[in-house]
Amino acid sequence: ALVLGGSQGNIEQVIGVGIKTRWRDEELARMQDLAERPVRWLATREEAVERYLKVSGLVGLVKEVSLCAQSGVATGDDDRYRLSTDPGIYAIGEPPVATLVSAARCQVLLAAGEHDAMAGVEDLKAIDPAATILSGLGHNAQVEDPAALWSLLSENK
């Protein structure tokens, strides 16, 4: 969203929720390791959905049969299943969040759930002092309470 907000003139506003802005060296090394691993194939769709929900932090927030859960899984030619995400995405390393925010040609709202252990609002406030705390929510605030995000967007038009 931040890249689009910085490159397109027809986007008025983007919101970044729970964006991790502070990375330890060991986290960056783990990301590189993940990027270099081969795709992990699973025997059943159910196993793949379970894995997707786990790595996405969505266990207990999203039902296994939901479109959200199912969209996180891809089917191979040999009737095996994998996560839809390409492991190569982790090769990006530390995202330049501050640079992307400052380059955006639209309004950027940054927010984090009050209980987000991965991406706290204090880290976001180093980039944008107006970053918002989403009360009572965690890292997947957009799933936990979509109405809270709509409210935030509506208040900041």
Functional labels for PLM-detected ranges:
Residues 137-150:
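Catalytic histidine-centered segment of alpha/beta-hydrolase-like enzymes
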Residues 2, 6, 10-45:
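Flexible "cap/lid" loop of the alpha/beta hydrolase fold
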Residues 74-127, 133:
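Conserved serine/cysteine hydrolase catalytic core
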Residues 19, 113, 136:
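Cofactor-binding loop segments of dinucleotide-utilizing enzymes, especially the Rossmann-like FAD-
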Residues 43-95:
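Conserved alpha/beta-hydrolase catalytic His-Asp/Glu region
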Residues 152-157:
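C-terminal alpha-helix
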Residues 42-43, 134, 143:
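Conserved aromatic
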Residues 22-24, 118, 140:
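Active-site loop signature of alpha/beta-hydrolase-fold enzymes
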